[in-house]
């Protein structure tokens, strides 16, 4: 009985450990179709992403190209503006220089015209001086008519000289001053014991200046120095 039971147990144990062949999974047609659809969707999705990335790259390239183009245009315009500014500044400087030159030329022309006119008037001033010097002191005291005439001539001379002075014309009377070759013309020299050598002791003809510029030097006699 024991022997039978042992044999039965061994037989049962062998059967339970018989290796089984691997089973092939059961795949339905609908599952296969779904898998194919998913693969195609994944492919299309990857392709769409690739196209989108490509388009983005193209857009970025176009934007970069446009930016470079705009930067180039900006640089060109900036350079052009700088050149125009330089030209404008030079033009303004040239115009101002021209204004200064024109102003100086106009002033020179005025001074020249006034100088010529003044020189023509100086003879009249000299004539007034000669006329007044022609009156003798004794005659002025003896005759009221001569005295009145002298006063009238002197007043006329004073009015005339004041008019010249208003236009920048001044008398140059260097009596007692040191000789200045820029303002005086020495016509003779004489020794004068009581005066300093080189001093103007006689004015033969008055000089005149126009706006501090000599238009006629004074003709003078100066003190001669002692000879060694």
Swiss-Prot record:
Principal subcellular localisation of the protein:
mitochondrion
Q: Does this UniProt record's set of keywords contain Chaperone?
A: yes
Regarding how it is modified after translation, the entry says: The N-terminus is blocked.
Give a yes or no for keyword Chaperone in this entry.
yes
Recorded GO cellular component terms are: mitochondrial inner membrane; mitochondrial matrix; mitochondrion; PAM complex, Tim23 associated import motor; TIM23 mitochondrial import inner membrane translocase complex
Q: Which cysteines are joined by disulfide bonds?
A: none
Subunit (UniProt): Component of the PAM complex, at least composed of SSC1 (mtHsp70), MGE1, TIM44, PAM16/TIM16, PAM17 and PAM18/TIM14. Interacts with SSQ1.
Instruction: Identify this protein by name.
Output: GrpE protein homolog, mitochondrial
């Amino acid at each position: 009985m024991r022997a039978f039971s042992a044999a039965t147990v061994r037989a049962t144990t062998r059967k339970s450990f018989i290796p089984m062949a691997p089973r092939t999974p059961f795949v339905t047609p609908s599952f296969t179709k779904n898998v194919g659809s998913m693969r195609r969707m994944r492919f299309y999705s990857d392709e769409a992403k690739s196209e989108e990335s490509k388009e983005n790259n193209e857009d970025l390239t176009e934007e970069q190209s446009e930016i470079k183009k705009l930067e180039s245009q900006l640089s060109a315009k900036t350079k052009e503006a700088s050149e125009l500014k330089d030209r404008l500044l030079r033009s303004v400087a040239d115009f101002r220089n021209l204004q200064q030159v024109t102003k100086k030329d106009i002033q020179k022309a005025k001074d020249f015209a006034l100088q010529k006119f003044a020189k023509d008037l100086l003879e009249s001033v000299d004539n007034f001086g000669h006329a007044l010097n022609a009156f003798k002191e004794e005659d002025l005291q003896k005759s009221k008519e001569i005295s009145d005439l002298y006063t009238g001539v002197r007043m006329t001379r004073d009015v005339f000289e004041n008019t010249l002075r208003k236009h920048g014309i001044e008398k140059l009377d260097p009596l007692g001053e040191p000789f200045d070759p820029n303002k005086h013309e020495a016509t003779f020299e004489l020794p004068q014991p009581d005066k300093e050598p080189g001093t103007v002791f006689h004015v033969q003809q008055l000089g005149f200046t126009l706006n501090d510029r000599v238009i006629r030097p004074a003709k003078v006699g100066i003190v001669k120095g002692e000879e060694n």
